């Protein structure tokens, strides 16, 4: 197995420079400072840029970061995270292609109880803290836009559980973990707001690694009937947003009822009745160094989803090849490094005090251009994108590419919104 390159943190300098590479070929670059991991600054205070008004906001933290509200076991290595990420991406792709079986299959009793819980929890990275019950018991929960039903472990909650076999559920995950329990309802406290009769699962038995740390459960932000967004639609208008921090050493936020009018950059949201949990988006083009890559529009015809739980963005094979080639062309001054897991475009930054990387932008339908920050382009010295096996597989916009951007899910209005530099 190839050794892992020394982890470096790339801190974005506030300026952008236009550098000449090869005659008159001008490309736009981000100028970065390379430093050791130990030099990372921990700042657990609220983001300096306030979220959109009009709703309730709760802090959001990385599961394994120093700002996490719960004790965590040793953080997984990047290679471990990428392996888990492959499983999640493969599951989502299978679900869209109509293949049955695998993670998230649910065994139900006589009456249909919605229990679409998503995939292996090991891929989920971000936490919020809420209160459930009267008086409220604090619950620290993973968030997932690919799951509908929220649930907590029974030992962390004793609520008004419904009775009868019709409310029992069982969920199986791809890693062999199983959770079973009762579908319940109770009061949910979100910051200064409260939601009465919030429905969620109360897990009464678990096997395998259902949760690897002291997290209490999962908050489903998917598009189905039992998700948090749908259950609170009467109060918050079926709109929510989040901002994922640039590193695990700083916080982000989750807002319910985000002000949709404050987002200028928008693109249509695509939905499928066959897979209602997921939020579709149409990626149309990719820009590197300010220049749009020559990728046929048909390459993106399989569509993509926006997902908080998938770590790395998956692109059609042809699109990824064009991105990788253009990025390498702009990084000729740095020696190539050994591939790492799903990353095949890596560089050796040894001895570098500053690093110049080409800008990368994603262009969505309707002309929405989303410029990625440095932490959304480079991860551990590698280009932070991965290729699908072909162009017919679903694309996934992962959470690394969403960092520092407030991403609006205006489910009621049928659109996504993007606001740069929100956390």
Q: What annotation goes with each model-predicted range?
A:
Residues 68-82, 87-93, 97-98, 104-198, ...:
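Signature of the N-terminal lobe/flap region of pepsin-like aspartyl proteases
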Residues 156-165, 238, 264-272, 321-341:
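Cytochrome P450 catalytic domain signature, combining two hallmark sequence patches
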Residues 2-68, 135, 143, 202-206, ...:
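Aspartic protease catalytic domain
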Residues 251-301:
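Flexible, small-/acidic-enriched active-site or ligand-binding loops
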Residues 220-222:
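C-terminal reverse transcriptase regions that engage the nucleic-acid substrate
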Residues 129-132, 185-193, 241-243, 288, ...:
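Short conserved beta-strand and strand-loop elements enriched in small hydrophobics
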Residues 236-257:
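Extended, H/D-rich, highly charged conserved domains that either
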Residues 120-137, 234, 283-302, 385-390:
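A short acidic-Thr-Gly-centered motif at the start of a beta-strand
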């Amino acid at each position: 197995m190839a050794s892992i390159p020394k982890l470096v943190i790339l801190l974005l300098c506030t300026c952008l420079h236009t550098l000449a590479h090869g005659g008159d070929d001008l490309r736009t670059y981000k100028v970065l400072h390379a430093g050791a991991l130990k030099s990372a600054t921990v700042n657990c205070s609220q983001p300096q840029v306030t979220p959109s008004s009009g709703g309730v906001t709760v802090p959001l933290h990385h599961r394994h970061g120093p700002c996490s509200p719960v004790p965590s076991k040793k953080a997984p290595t990047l290679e471990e995270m990428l392996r888990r990420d492959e499983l999640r991406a493969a599951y989502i792709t299978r679900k869209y292609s109509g293949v049955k079986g695998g993670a998230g299959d649910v065994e139900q009793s006589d009456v249909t109880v919605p229990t679409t819980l998503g995939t292996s929890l090991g891929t989920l990275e971000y936490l919020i803290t809420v209160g459930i019950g009267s008086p409220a018991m604090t619950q620290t929960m993973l968030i997932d836009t690919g799951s509908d039903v929220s649930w907590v472990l029974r030992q962390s909650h004793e609520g008004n559980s419904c009775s009868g076999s019709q409310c029992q559920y069982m969920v199986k995950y791809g890693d062999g973990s199983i959770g079973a329990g009762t579908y319940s309802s109770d009061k949910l406290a979100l910051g200064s707001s409260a939601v009465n009769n919030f429905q969620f699962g109360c897990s009464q038995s678990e096997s395998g690694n259902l949760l690897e740390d002291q997290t209490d459960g999962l908050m489903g932000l998917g598009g189905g009937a039992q998700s948090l967004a749908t259950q609170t639609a009467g109060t918050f208008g079926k709109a929510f947003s989040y901002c994922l921090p640039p590193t695990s050493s700083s916080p982000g936020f989750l807002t319910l009822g985000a002000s949709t009018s404050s987002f200028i950059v928008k693109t249509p949201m695509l939905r499928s009745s066959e897979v209602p949990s997921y939020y579709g988006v149409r990626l149309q083009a990719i820009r590197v160094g300010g220049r749009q890559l020559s990728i046929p529009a048909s390459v993106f015809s399989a569509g993509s989803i926006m997902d908080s739980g998938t770590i790395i963005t998956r692109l059609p094979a042809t699109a990824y090849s064009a991105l990788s080639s253009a990025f390498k062309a702009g990084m000729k001054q740095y020696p190539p490094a050994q591939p790492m897991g799903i990353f095949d475009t890596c560089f050796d930054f040894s001895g570098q005090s500053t690093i110049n990387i080409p800008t990368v932008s994603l262009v969505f339908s309707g002309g929405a251009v989303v410029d990625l920050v440095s932490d959304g382009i480079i991860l551990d010295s590698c280009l932070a994108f991965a290729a699908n096996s072909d162009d017919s597989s679903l694309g996934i916009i992962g959470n690394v590419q969403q960092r520092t951007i407030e991403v609006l899910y205006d489910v009621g209005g049928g659109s996504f919104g993007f606001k740069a530099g929100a956390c």
